[in-house]
Each structure stands twice: as C-alpha cells, then as structure tokens.
Swiss-Prot record:
This is Aminomethyltransferase. It is an enzyme of class 2 (transferase). The gene is gcvT. GO terms for molecular function: aminomethyltransferase activity; transaminase activity. One of its GO terms (biological process) is glycine decarboxylation via glycine cleavage system. PANTHER family: AMINOMETHYLTRANSFERASE, AMINOMETHYLTRANSFERASE, MITOCHONDRIAL. The glycine cleavage system is composed of four proteins: P, T, L and H. It comes from the Bacteria. It catalyses: N(6)-[(R)-S(8)-aminomethyldihydrolipoyl]-L-lysyl-[protein] + (6S)-5,6,7,8-tetrahydrofolate = N(6)-[(R)-dihydrolipoyl]-L-lysyl-[protein] + (6R)-5,10-methylene-5,6,7,8-tetrahydrofolate + NH4(+). Keywords: Aminotransferase, Transferase. Pfam families: GCV_T, GCV_T_C. It comes from Geobacillus kaustophilus (strain HTA426).
Length: 364
C-alpha cells in the first residue's frame, strides 16, 4: 500500500497525475512538466513535498552526536539557521543528504529524503550515545515548497512577517501564514529563490489553497515531481539514488563544500573522504551535452576511447536550455571539460562533450 501525503485529496481538484515515488503516491505533474518548470523559472510554483522525512534531535548531547554523524560542521549552526550536510558510511559511501535546522540550543530538525526516512532513523538510532532523544515526526508534519522569482512577493501577501529578512538557509519558526503556524525557511531544491514551509499535517490543505489563491495574479502553478526533478537537475542538485548512493561519495558527487574533514570532531567516513579531497576522488560527476541526437538517461553507460568509463546518473532534454544534457559519474582521468565521450543509447554509441556544471545558475 503506497503512502499518501495530507494533500492527496487536493490533487484530484488540481488535475494531478500521480506516480509511485519512494513508497509514496505523489503527483508527477498537474498541467505539464514543461509548463510547471517554466513557471518556477519565470514566476513561481508550489510543490507538495510532505513525503520528505522529519526527525527531531534533542538533548544535551545533540551537537556531539550530530558532529559524529554529519560531514558538515554542525557547530557552525546557530538558532534560525539551516545547513546542507550528508551522512556517510566508513567507506565514504553516502547514507543520505539532508538539511539540518537548528531551532534552539540542543534542538535540531533533520529533513531527510522520503525513501530513506526509515533507514536514516535506524542509522541515527544505532549511534545514539548520552543525552540524545530522537523522534520521527514525519507523519504529523507537512512540507510545502513555494519556489521561483515571485515566491517572496506571493508569500508576503499571506503573512505580516518580513520575509525579506530571511537570508538563504535561514528560517523562522511559528510564523503565521494565512492563519496557519509554520516554520518558514529560505531554502529549496530548484535553483531558484523560494521558501519551504513546515506545518502540522492537518493544516496543509488550507495552506496549499491559500498560497495558490494568493499567487493567482502571478500565474503560480501547482507543480509535481517531474518539474522538481528537471529543475534540480539543471541546477545540478543531487538526487539520492542517482548522484548519491551507498557506493557514491559526496566528494565524487562534487559536494566537497559540505565535507569538513578539518573539523575538530571525527565523523564516520572522515578518513576516506579526507583522502579523496586531498588526492582527488577515483570518479567525478561531470556534465555532458550530446553532440549526436539522443537523450542520455539514468544508467546509460559512458565510453571514452572505446573503454567504459562511467554511467549517466540523470539526463533529459533541458526545458530551459533546450539541449539534451546529462550528469555522469566517470573515471577522474577522463573528467576534463571539452573531452569527447560516447553514451550508449539503445545499443548505439553516440557522441557527447563534457561541459561545465551547473547547467543553470539563476541571476542574482
């Protein structure tokens, strides 16, 4: 039986087409993926991301506990700030990537990938020492994401809180948005400015309807996972199971900025990740742009000089760039910009170039 978010009953009214994703029945699109993608790049789009997992970490030992498990330096956080980080195995493979919100002293909220929530909770629980309390609050929490250049303007119509005061990766808790108490965070997964809002599950439908109504004059669209994927892909934001996995390290995936091997507290996977940062990883995530006609898809093999050198992690025809592009994990010695490679597409080896990433970066 697939899980459903608190907004499932709203989908039908919005014309959603649903699919299975990580054990959830989720909307892949409402109008079309291209329309929704364009709405976020040019105006704003509203996503239901209530399938994501939320785990509360409290207790006097919280910081030491998180420092031991996280690649980033959690000690740099302050109340009201969020941080992107990862958890790794001893061999450097990735348990998950996540956001940490520091709500107060010894009070943290972890937001993890939907398909990994149970695995992550078990991993965290297995490493608890001292005064640390874990609580999985996923089922009672809803998460909406309003993303795009018009996001601040639209959301400001619903709250007296000054959203301009929120910098990227900062948040405020207990903000009243159209009568609903929410944690409002200036974060997202699209490459655009925007906000993620966490509220009680029972308040989600009212908040969803209020945001869409407030955004009507800006042509804000409800958006599904299809557009969320093409948007994050153009911005080269990783998806667990594709750019990250238990056999792909954060350094290989180009996420070394979130791996603080010099922090005082040793963390799981530190030795391998430190070596990869210092000596270079065996593989690197690169961008590829097709020369021949064809679309690189997840799992397609990549060749250089007749030798298999890696595989495509994500690929599509970019709605913004109108090009057939992909991300690929390849041997480090072939990961040079301008290098010609071949992608095996349905038994044919088609030419592509390695190109700079991210494919898309919004104008500041």
């Amino acid at each position: 039986m697939l899980k459903r978010t608190p907004l499932f009953s709203v989908y039908a009214r919005c014309g959603a087409k649903t699919i299975e994703f990580g054990g959830w029945e989720m909307p892949v699109q409402f109008s079309s993926i291209k329309e929704e993608h364009e709405a976020v790049r040019t105006r704003a789009g509203l996503f239901d991301v209530s399938h994501m997992g939320e785990i509360v970490v409290r207790g006097r030992g919280s910081l030491a506990f998180l420092q031991k498990l996280m690649t980033n330096d959690v000690a740099k956080l302050r109340p009201g700030r969020a941080q992107y980080t990862l958890m790794c195995y001893e061999d450097g493979g990735t348990v998950d990537d996540l956001l940490i919100y520091q709500k107060g002293e010894n009070d943290y909220l972890l937001v993890v990938n939907a398909a990994n929530t149970e695995k992550d909770f078990a991993w965290l629980s297995g490493h608890v020492e001292g005064d640390v309390e874990l609580q999985d609050v996923s089922s009672e929490t809803a998460q909406l994401a309003l993303q795009g250049p018009a996001a601040e303007r639209v959301l400001q119509r619903l709250t007296d809180f000054d959203l301009a005061a929120l910098r990227p990766f900062s948040f405020a808790d207990g903000v009243e948005v159209s009568g609903v108490k929410a944690l409002v965070s200036r974060t997202g997964y699209t490459g655009e400015d925007g906000f993620e809002l966490y509220c009680k599950a029972e308040d989600a439908a009212a908040l969803w309807e209020a945001i869409l109504a407030a955004g009507a004059r800006d042509s804000v669209l409800p958006c599904g996972l299809g557009a969320r994927d093409t948007l994050r892909f153009e911005a080269c934001l990783p998806l667990y199971g594709q750019e990250l996995s238990d056999s792909i390290s954060p350094v290989e995936a180009g996420l070394g900025f979130a791996v603080k091997t010099e922090k005082e507290t040793p963390f799981i996977g530190q030795a391998v990740l430190k070596r990869q940062k210092e000596e270079g990883p065996p593989r690197r995530l690169v961008g590829i742009e097709m020369i021949d006609r064809g679309i690189p898809r997840h799992g397609y093999l990549v060749f250089a000089d007749g030798e298999e050198v890696g595989f495509v992690t994500t690929g599509t025809q970019s709605p913004t760039l109108k090009k057939n592009i992909g991300l690929a994990l390849v041997k480090a010695d072939v990961a040079a910009i301008g290098r010609e490679v071949e992608v095996d597409i349905r038994g044919k080896r088609l030419k592509a170039n390695i190109v700079p990433i991210p494919f898309y970066r919004r104008a500041k």
